[in-house]
C-alpha cells in the first residue's frame, strides 16, 4: 500500500487527522497511500526511541499476540504503536479494545484495507477510536500531484454559480479524461500500474470480500467473473 511520497502528505491534509488521539484507525482501499502516510508521519513527527511500526501479517504474530507485543513494548518505554493492515490479524478489534483499556499510556494507530471488515469490527471500539476513511485522489489532488497545477477548494455553491476558475488550464477536459482513466491511485504513473491495479482488484475480490462474507476463495473468484461479464 506504499504510494509515491511526492506531495502525498500535503495532498491528504484535507483529512485533518487528529494524530494525538489515544487510538485511531485509517482505512481505505488498497493502494491509496495509507502505509506511506503512516511512514511519513513517523519520519517527520515521531521519536524512533519510543515508536514502533509493525505489519499485522508479520510472522511474529504466528506465535505472539498484539497484547504480548504491546506489553513488551510498553515495558521498554514504548509510547506509540503503529499497526499496518490490522484486518489481517484475527479478532483484532477485541485485542485493541483490551489494549486501549489496559495501557492508557500507549497510543495505538492502525490501518486497514478491508473496509468491510474494519467497520464490522469497530463495534468493539465504539467511542474509543475515531476511524478516518482515506479515499484515492480527487481531480484537484491529481492535478496538484502529477501536473503541479494547484487549484483551490471550492464549495458546491461556488461551482453551481460558475465562480470556479482553474488557472493554468485552457482546456481541462483532456486532463479530466486522463484522471478518469487512471487518476484515482497515487501509483498511477508507475510503469507497472496495470499489474498493481490488477493485484488490488484480485486481493479485494478473492480475499477481502470472501473473508468478510464468510465465502470460500472459489466463490470470490466466481464473483469476479460475474463482474467481468
Predicted regions: what is each one?
Residues 30-31:
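Walker A (P-loop) phosphate-binding loop of P-loop NTPases
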Residues 26:
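Hydrophobic anchor at the beta1->P-loop junction of P-loop NTPases
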Residues 49-77:
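Short glycine-rich substrate-engagement loop in P-loop NTPases that contacts/grips substrate
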Residues 116-130, 146-147:
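Short regulatory helix/loop adjacent to the ATP-binding pocket of P-loop NTPases
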Residues 107-113:
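Structural recognition of the conserved hydrophobic beta-strand(s) that form the central parallel beta-sheet
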Residues 144-229:
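Interdomain hinge/linker elements that couple catalytic modules in large macromolecular machines
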Residues 34-35:
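Conserved lysine of the Walker
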Residues 1-12:
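Single conserved hydrophobic/aromatic residue that forms the stacking wall/gate
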